[in-house]
């Protein structure tokens, strides 16, 4: 086991990506993947899996603030199931509430409005999802 994990922040137009190490509990952003109505370039995801060889994949689970599901929740679950089905890698869902808000805030502090491009926000959200996963002891 390498201790490497990949995280995805699922979206219908852009999917944020981060890679992290379990041993350090840290993550860093990778370029976001463009999606068409939630369908990613599966060849690109396959290349990411071959390059990073993750032990597991974490997919952010979008929930309402009260913990109930929203329309995007089912689509994120489907995305996670497809990754598992196509590539046979272990996939876990992780609560992503407020990750985008936190990502926008952090990027804005670093570079103002210019730093808030969609791909950067999505991948920064994936970093937050993965670091939250590590912080919870997984």
From Swiss-Prot:
UniProt subcellular location: Cytoplasm
Gene Ontology terms, MF aspect: nuclease activity
Main localization of the protein described in the UniProt heading: cytoplasm
UniProt keyword list: Cytoplasm, Hydrolase, Nuclease, Ribosome biogenesis
GO CC term, one of those recorded: cytosol
GO BP annotations, alphabetical order: rRNA 5'-end processing
UniProt xrefs under Gene3D superfamilies: YqgF/RNase H-like domain
EC number: 3.1.-.-
NCBIfam families: RNAse_H_YqgF
Entries under PANTHER family matching the protein: POLYNUCLEOTIDYL TRANSFERASE, RIBONUCLEASE H-LIKE SUPERFAMILY PROTEIN
The family this protein is said to belong to: Belongs to the YqgF nuclease family.
Function of the protein: Could be a nuclease involved in processing of the 5'-end of pre-16S rRNA.
Protein name: Putative pre-16S rRNA nuclease
Native species: Escherichia coli O139:H28 (strain E24377A / ETEC)
Lineage, top ranks: Bacteria, Pseudomonadati, Pseudomonadota, Gammaproteobacteria, Enterobacterales
Gene of this entry: yqgF
């Amino acid at each position: 086991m390498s201790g490497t994990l990949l995280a995805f922040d699922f979206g219908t137009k852009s999917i944020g990506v981060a890679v992290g190490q379990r041993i350090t509990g840290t993550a860093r952003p990778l370029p976001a993947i463009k999606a068409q109505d939630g369908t990613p370039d599966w060849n690109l995801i396959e290349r990411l899996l071959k390059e990073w060889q993750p032990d597991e994949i974490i997919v952010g689970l979008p929930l309402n603030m009260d913990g109930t599901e929203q329309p995007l929740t089912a689509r994120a679950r489907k995305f996670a199931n497809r990754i598992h089905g196509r590539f046979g890698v272990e996939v876990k869902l992780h609560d992503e509430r407020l990750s985008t808000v936190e990502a926008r805030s952090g990027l804005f502090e670093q570079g103002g409005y210019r730093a808030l491009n969609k791909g950067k926000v999505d991948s920064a959200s994936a970093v937050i999802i993965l670091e939250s996963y590590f912080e919870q002891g997984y």
